[in-house]
């Protein structure tokens, strides 16, 4: 597909890399010549220095033949303007990143009036993910499928869970738990396990289950399942605003530490039920005086990654609460993984995942659309949800007879209101939603899960 991408910041760079690696014809546009040259030299993309809202620049990029137009500059208004001009000049799908909370209640109206295909708000998505984690604090990562009915949950296996030396096939009978272990991180590697795989203390385990079954499983292995009742948030940006709204609706006591007095005034008016503390969040004595040692959740949401890391490490030393750390930069995730920062949230990853999912779905509107896509475990594993529209070599055949690709696990089939962890005798049918976890990147269609 021919894709035009406006904005060569961190998200734009990550998207250019991912989309070009998947074989798309990508053209990037940015007013910063150095950024354009860096991306065009680093990846197989064409670069144009110019204004993405200029019809001349768009024509030079080939907007008339473009299939997809993506605007991820630092300005919401510019992103919307670029998409509006792109829709007028071409016949493409247009995707805009819009982050300002002022637009949060107007996104559907904006999409309809401008004709934008999709709008992604990474701050709102990050807040939703953090909210899920605070409602299920024993998990370090939660991704949702099937309109939230199915969850992919990650946790660290400790001696307290009594699962050391247990084979995966023994879990349903030993713990009376209807869950499916989908991936295990061990010694720096990732494994898609079979039933004979034996768990060890220290493993990072990712499993799939409904919310109810996950709750039962965590109770049986003595992991926290009670939602937090109070949260201390450092940093009063957009994510803190969206998160506080969700938490307050669920009767969670919220305190926000923000150093900017003007921002504190805005938050106090927008969130009258939250306690706004106008103070430097890096002031350790202040955090301790405000109950850091007793808080049930500590969330570091400043705009500086290094500050968030240090804040979380300090909180870990003084608190037994749930820890959540926001990280903006994508290039240091392998280093951060060794610091035990609790749950790490990457808003920029969320933007990339959503757009890649959207583009892949466009390529397979006939066979089976990708409904949901997550790149998990440090981008080494893809978890995908397909909607099956027509018969193929993957449908109507017992799973035991399907020759699935290596390092791929078919985890779940949803059929209407039925949610099923499939067995060998089950079949995929037209109309099903199918969830797959794989080490292979770039699957576009359900047919791709079967060996040629």
Kindly give the residue locations of the regions a language model identified.
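Cytosolic regulatory regions of ion transport systems
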Residues: 1-452
């Amino acid at each position: 597909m021919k894709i035009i991408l406006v904005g060569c910041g961190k998200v734009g760079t990550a998207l250019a890399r991912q989309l070009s690696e998947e074989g798309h014809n990508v053209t990037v546009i940015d007013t910063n010549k150095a950024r354009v040259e860096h991306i065009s030299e680093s990846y197989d993309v064409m670069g144009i220095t110019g204004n993405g809202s200029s019809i001349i620049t768009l024509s030079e990029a080939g907007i008339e033949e473009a299939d997809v137009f993506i605007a991820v500059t630092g300005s919401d208004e510019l992103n919307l303007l670029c998409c509006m001009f792109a829709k007028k000049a071409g016949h493409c799908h247009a995707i805009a990143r819009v982050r300002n909370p002022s637009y949060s209640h107007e996104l559907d109206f904006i999409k309809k009036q401008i004709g934008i295909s999709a709008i992604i708000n990474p701050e709102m998505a990050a807040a939703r993910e953090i909210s899920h984690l605070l409602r299920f604090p024993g998990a370090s990562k939660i991704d949702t499928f099937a309109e939230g009915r199915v969850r992919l949950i990650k946790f660290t296996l400790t001696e307290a869970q009594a699962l050391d030396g247990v084979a995966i096939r023994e879990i349903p009978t030993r713990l009376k738990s209807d869950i499916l272990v989908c991936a295990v991180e061990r010694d720096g590697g990732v494994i898609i396990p079979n039933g004979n795989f034996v768990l060890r203390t220290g493993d990072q385990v990712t499993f799939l289950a409904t919310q109810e079954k996950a709750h039962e499983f965590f109770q049986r292995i003595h992991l926290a399942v009670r939602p937090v009742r109070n949260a201390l948030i450092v940093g009063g940006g957009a994510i803190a605003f969206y998160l506080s709204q969700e938490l307050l609706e669920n009767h969670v006591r919220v305190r926000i530490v923000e150093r900017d007095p003007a921002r504190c005034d805005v938050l106090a008016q927008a969130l009258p039920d939250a306690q706004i503390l106008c103070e430097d969040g890096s002031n350790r004595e202040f955090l301790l005086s405000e109950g850091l040692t007793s808080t049930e959740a500590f969330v570091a949401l400043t705009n500086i990654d290094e500050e968030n890391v240090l804040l979380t490490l300090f909180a870990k030393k003084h608190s037994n609460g749930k820890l959540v750390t926001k990280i903006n930069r994508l290039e240091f995730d392998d280093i951060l993984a060794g610091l035990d920062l609790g749950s790490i949230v990457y808003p920029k990853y969320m933007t990339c995942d959503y757009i890649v999912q959207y583009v892949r779905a466009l390529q397979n509107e006939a066979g089976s659309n990708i409904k949901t896509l997550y790149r998990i475990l440090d981008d080494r594993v893809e978890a995908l949800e397909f909607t099956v529209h027509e018969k193929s070599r993957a449908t109507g055949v017992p799973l035991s007879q399907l020759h699935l690709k290596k390092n791929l696990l078919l985890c779940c089939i949803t059929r209407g209101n039925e949610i099923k962890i499939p067995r060998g005798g089950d079949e995929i049918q037209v109309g099903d939603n199918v969830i797959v976890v794989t080490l292979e990147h770039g699957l576009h269609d359900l047919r791709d899960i079967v060996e040629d």
